[in-house]
């Protein structure tokens, strides 16, 4: 069976992730390289493992997380759909089980807030993992005077935590924000759609979604 480690160590996949990120660098986007996809993979796995999903489902979620942004190699627009098609070809060539390919492709094709929906548990975990990866280290632009709103919001986040409570009824995204660089309103201006999708994803997993910024509950 194909494992997460197999995918992480695949030279072709690493090339696609690197080149996709290079395209986003050219367009001024935040980091979407190995750091981001690894965080997303591990977080998606954490969510399903914590909720008691089978070990293989957890592994499939991690694979989906690692591959979820390769569509940026084609174009940022519709990257979830192009990424799903790329993932299908890659996984098929690696003799991945068709049932697992179907789950991974569906999750990748539904992870973006523009058209995505948490259609299965892996898709839901991927959405929550991806949208919660907000952090200062993703900002590449070091000239604070030229920051756009995306730079300001990501740079302002000193710490980000996504945790499920012990009762497995609640998933909470806690952000520590330095308002010197970005306001809470800035966050909502660019992330409102993402937070709505996170709420839907949490509900798919039988959870409530809560957002806390600087210890204040906002959702």
Go through the PLM ranges and name each one.
Residues 21, 41-45, 88:
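Amphipathic, well-packed alpha-helical segments that form the structural scaffold of globular domains
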Residues 4-22:
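Short alpha-helical hairpin
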Residues 21-30, 181-184:
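Short hinge/gating elements
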Residues 25-26, 36, 49-164:
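Divalent metal-dependent catalytic cores for phosphoryl transfer on phosphate-bearing substrates
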Residues 2, 28-51:
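N-terminal low-complexity, intrinsically disordered segments
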Residues 29-32, 117, 190:
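Non-transmembrane, amphipathic alpha-helical segments
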Residues 133-219:
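Terminal helices and disordered tails flanking the catalytic cores of nucleotide-processing hydrolases
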Residues 14, 34, 38, 192:
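Electropositive phosphate-/nucleotide-binding environments in soluble metabolic enzymes
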């Amino acid at each position: 069976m194909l494992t997460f480690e197999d995918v992480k160590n695949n030279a072709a996949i690493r090339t696609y992730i690197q080149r996709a990120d290079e395209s986003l660098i050219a367009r001024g986007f935040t980091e979407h390289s190995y750091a981001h996809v690894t965080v997303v993979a591990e977080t998606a796995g954490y969510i399903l493992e914590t909720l008691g999903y089978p070990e293989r489902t957890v592994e499939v979620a991690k694979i989906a997380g690692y591959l979820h942004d390769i569509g940026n190699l084609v174009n940022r627009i519709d990257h979830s759909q192009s990424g799903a098609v790329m993932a299908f070809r890659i996984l098929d060539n690696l003799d991945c089980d068709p049932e697992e390919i179907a789950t991974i492709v569906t999750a990748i094709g539904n992870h973006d807030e523009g058209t995505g929906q948490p259609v299965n548990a892996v898709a839901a975990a991927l959405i929550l993992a991806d949208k919660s990866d907000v952090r200062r280290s993703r900002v590449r632009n070091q000239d604070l005077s030229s920051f756009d709103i995306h730079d300001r919001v990501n740079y302002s986040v000193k710490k980000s935590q996504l945790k499920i409570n012990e009762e497995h009824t609640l998933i909470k995204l806690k952000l520590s924000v330095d308002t010197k660089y970005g306001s809470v309103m800035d966050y909502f201006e660019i992330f409102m759609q993402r937070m709505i999708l996170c709420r839907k994803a949490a509900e798919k997993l039988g959870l409530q979604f809560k957002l806390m910024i600087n210890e204040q509950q906002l959702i």
